[in-house]
């Protein structure tokens, strides 16, 4: 027995409209003309609007003299019947265009048009003209109904309850909200621009498994599944990192993947359990070079897609043009917490006292590195408005990053924050197999101590490192959050076509 999404409750007045439309569909079925599929579209509304935008050049006389005939199709978004002549507006993927309909030209099709509803999908063929108000219009010579819409489109699309409905019924949102369509068009352009940027620099796009025998590559709780034929428990990947670094071992020295990750965590305006990441690795690069790369790819993507490096995001004006600030984590913590000394930053007991004073709840198992991170997240993170790289994280919270040569207990790692939100994470990769094995073992102990997000021990990855991995820099950029930044969206749900929602009651 298969599970089904419960049918949403339909208001009584909407029920009557649906019944009326079903009756119209029944009549079409009786005529044998329901849902035809033989119309060939040749033109798009947006292209016509752009080509004939100059009203001074393309007067009604000039348009008609051109002899231009168009074949278009789209959704009926408005209609105004005025006896022997009517106006309508259709929408396709590129925009909208007005139709001018005349009864003496269309005959029976005009009579049929009077019974069509907003939301129906229609085809039109005809010449071009311009109305007295200057609006470009298709002067219909032929008109057909291609798809009968059974549900009425919403008259209003705002307010809290409707925002949730937009997420649940994105198909309706895309029909009636041009701004939503523009966000997802920009999302596609952003990903395309990033791919082009990396491809131009000899990075190789690869695909790695989505189901893992051992979850790894990030400290996160995984989703579990089961392979029936092999009788084997598997995990949806939390990150592709360990597979991508295996490829670096194999000699693919510049690799990247743009794909889904899955983390069994909470849902918020910043988090969705399924999300898109760009992850890349470059042999013979340090975390300083990867910071340079991160800064440049974000800046160039903004310029390519938006034509500017200045954006507004959640009430803040962000400038991506200047060099991004680089700030050690311990220095940032001390700057915002003058009571914390340099010596305190690596003193577990001192940091515990500061956490208690700051009312930060911590677990008894936390060492100084985790405590320092907790203080950073509570007191510093939200203050980082302009692009800032926070660098040199403690080893305890960076199990895959290379240890610092000059600062014991710290790593060659960075995170990028913009307007208080993390957008990227990268580091010089740990390529010492013995050090990595010891850190995996520490993660196993943390998991045994109740940390659901701690990593497992991946013996095959250790074996790969034992063959030798070149000094390597790695990077992960959250695509969803980058799209939020470049589209000014305040919720991750606004940049996901189908965000996760609780099932409807």
UniProtKB/Swiss-Prot annotation:
Its EC number is 6.1.1.6. Its main location: cytoplasm. InterPro entries: Aa-tRNA-synt_II, aa-tRNA-synth_II, aa-tRNA-synth_II/BPL/LPL, Lys-tRNA-ligase_II, Lys-tRNA-ligase_II_N, Lys-tRNA-synth_II_C, NA-bd_OB-fold, NA-bd_OB_tRNA. Keywords: Aminoacyl-tRNA synthetase, ATP-binding, Cytoplasm, Ligase, Magnesium, Metal-binding, Nucleotide-binding, Protein biosynthesis. GO terms for cellular component: cytosol. GO terms for biological process: lysyl-tRNA aminoacylation. Its cofactor is Mg(2+). Gene3D superfamilies: Bira Bifunctional Protein, Domain 2, Nucleic acid-binding proteins. Binds 3 Mg(2+) ions per subunit. Mg(2+) 2 binds at residue 422. The keyword Protein biosynthesis applies. It is found in: Cytoplasm. Belongs to the class-II aminoacyl-tRNA synthetase family. Homodimer. This is Lysine--tRNA ligase. It comes from Xanthomonas euvesicatoria pv. vesicatoria (strain 85-10) (Xanthomonas campestris pv. vesicatoria). The lineage of its organism: Bacteria, Pseudomonadati, Pseudomonadota, Gammaproteobacteria, Lysobacterales. The gene is lysS.
């Amino acid at each position: 027995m298969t599970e089904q999404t419960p049918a949403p409750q339909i208001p009584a007045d909407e029920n009557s409209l649906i019944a009326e439309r079903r009756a119209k569909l029944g009549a079409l079925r009786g005529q044998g003309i329901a849902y035809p599929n033989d119309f060939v579209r040749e033109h798009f509304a947006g292209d016509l609007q752009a080509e004939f935008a100059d009203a001074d050049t393309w007067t009604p006389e000039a348009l008609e003299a051109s002899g231009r005939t168009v074949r278009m199709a789209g959704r009926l978004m408005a209609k105004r019947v005025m006896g022997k002549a009517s106006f309508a507006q259709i929408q396709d993927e590129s925009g909208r265009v007005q139709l001018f309909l005349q009864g003496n030209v269309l005959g029976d099709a005009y009579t049929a048009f009077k019974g069509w509803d907003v939301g129906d999908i229609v085809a039109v063929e005809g010449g071009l003209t311009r109305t007295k108000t200057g609006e470009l219009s298709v002067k219909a010579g032929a008109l057909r109904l291609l798809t009968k819409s059974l549900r009425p489109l919403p008259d209003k699309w705002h307010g809290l309850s409707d925002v949730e409905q937009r997420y649940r019924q994105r198909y309706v949102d895309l029909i009636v909200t041009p701004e939503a369509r523009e966000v997802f068009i920009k999302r596609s352009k952003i990903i395309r621009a990033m791919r082009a940027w990396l491809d131009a620099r000899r990075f190789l796009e690869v695909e790695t498994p989505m189901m893992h025998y051992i979850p790894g590559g990030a400290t996160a709780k995984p989703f579990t599944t089961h392979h029936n034929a092999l009788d084997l428990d598997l995990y949806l990947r939390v990150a592709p990192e360990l597979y991508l670094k295996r490829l670096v071992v194999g000699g693919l020295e510049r690799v990247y993947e743009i794909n889904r990750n899955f983390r069994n965590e909470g849902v918020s305006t910043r988090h969705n359990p399924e999300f898109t990441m760009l992850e890349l690795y470059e042999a013979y690069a340090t975390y300083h070079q990867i910071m340079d790369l991160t800064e440049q790819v974000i800046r160039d993507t903004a310029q390519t897609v938006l034509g500017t490096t200045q954006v507004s995001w959640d009430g803040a004006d962000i400038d991506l043009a200047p060099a991004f600030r680089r700030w050690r984590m311990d220095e940032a913590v001390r700057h915002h917490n003058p009571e914390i000394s340099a010596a305190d930053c690596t003193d577990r007991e001192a940091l515990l006292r500061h956490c208690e004073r700051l009312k930060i709840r911590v677990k008894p198992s936390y060492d100084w590195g985790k405590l320092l991170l907790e203080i950073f997240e509570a007191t510093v993170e939200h203050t980082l408005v302009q692009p800032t790289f926070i660098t040199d994280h403690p080893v305890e919270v960076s199990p895959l990053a290379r240890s610092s040569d000059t600062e014991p207990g710290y790593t060659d790692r960075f995170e990028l924050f913009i307007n208080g939100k993390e957008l990227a994470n990268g580091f010089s990769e740990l390529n010492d197999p013995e050090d990595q094995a010891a850190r995996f073992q520490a993660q196993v102990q943390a998991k045994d101590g109740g940390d659901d997000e701690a990593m497992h021990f991946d013996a095959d990855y250790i074996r790969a490192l034992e063959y030798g991995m070149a000094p390597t820099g790695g990077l992960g950029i959250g695509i969803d959050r980058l799209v939020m930044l470049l589209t000014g969206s305040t919720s991750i749900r606004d940049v996901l076509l189908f965000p996760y929602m609780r099932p409807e009651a």
